[in-house]
Amino acid sequence: MGQTITTPLSLTLDHWSEVRARAHNQGVEVRKKKWITLCEAEWVMMNVGWPREGTFSLDNISQVEKKIFAPGPYGHPDQVPYITTWRSLATDPPSWVRPFLPPPKPPTSLPQPLSPQPSAPLTSSLYPVLPKSDPPKPPVLPPDPSSPLIDLLTEEPPPYPGGHGPPPSGPRTPTASPIASRLRERRENPAEESQALPLREGPNNRPQYWPFSASDLYNWKSHNPPFSQDPVALTNLIESILVTHQPTWDDCQQLLQALLTGEERQRVLLEARKQVPGEDGRPTQLPNVIDETFPLTRPNWDFATPAGREHLRLYRQLLLAGLRGAARRPTNLAQVKQVVQGKEETPA
């Protein structure tokens, strides 16, 4: 009897309930049919080395992410929840994924060159070996307050002709997660999508805050149609930002301020507050519950605590629901009244 070969794709399908739960914890939803289509067809046709049977290799996942997060019309915002869930399974694997992880790469450190050992000096019992005396050091004089000395730590260096030296190294940045590293690398290249990352785990699993920059907001606004023209496209963009960046409450307001008009923001917030769940899971009409779950003024949510992160996760989900609700625009009756039946046209 033949044996069924287990692949990363078939493994995720066998544990689909856990995959969906993992995606839900990140604030997104994934569907099995699209999960299979992306893995077996669309990501394979990107020609970046993605195998049809799937993989938990971070190198392959990063190559697919570059295509998905490409700016403007070249990206695929609708695929963000799926590749983000793949990465989550690879970076924080459950027990059933660990046997299928690729082996870690060996360190690429170069071997230290062998330096010849100095030969021992010839000694003799007739002549004692005298220790070598260090050359005399010049005396350290206290600075003369009247002398025009330059403080090299505070003065700017003089201009040099033709920069041929190595570029100056920038300040060291705190350690961030693989997604944060990927997004920050793209920020160095202005031709690619902006890479702000408001909230990610740093050293000791403590969240660190990276605010949006003006260039991030400008690129998102200039490379995408307005909400009134194509609400679905802009909603997909904002969804990808909410998933990958995990913004705080203030960041969400800044994002809405940059991408939506005042009237559009009011519609989105109104639709989102209609979806606030009550104790039974259905939308509630209790003002205190609505204000606590989806506040219009800055809440006292600490993203460094589990409770604060849970508040932010639910807030981002409701904000996305508000965007989808506001995208369903009502019929403009004024435009309907402008339609006049022609003389040769039938009422049908």
UniProtKB/Swiss-Prot annotation:
Annotated InterPro entries: G_retro_matrix, G_retro_matrix_sf, Gag_p12, Gag_P30, Retrov_capsid_N, Retroviral_Gag-Pol_poly, Retrovr_matrix
The record places the lipid (N-myristoyl glycine) at G2
Q: Which UniProt keywords apply?
A: Capsid protein, Host cell membrane, Host membrane, Host-virus interaction, Lipoprotein, Membrane, Myristate, RNA-binding, Viral budding, Viral budding via the host ESCRT complexes, Viral matrix protein, Viral release from host cell, Virion
Protein known as: Gag polyprotein
Query: Which GO CC terms are listed, alphabetically?
Result: host cell plasma membrane; membrane; viral capsid
Which residue positions hold the site described Cleavage?
Y127, P128, L197, P198
List compositional bias (Pro residues) regions by residue number: 100-119, 136-146, 156-171
Q: Which GO terms of the molecular function aspect are on file?
A: RNA binding; structural constituent of virion
Q: Where is the composition biased (Low complexity)?
A: 120-132
The yes or no answer to whether the keyword Repressor is present is: no
What's the gene?
A: gag
Q: What else is known?
A: This protein is synthesized as a Gag-Fes polyprotein.
Output the superkingdom of the source species.
Viruses
Q: Where is this motif: PPXY motif?
A: 157-160
* UniProt record, GO biological process: viral budding via host ESCRT complex
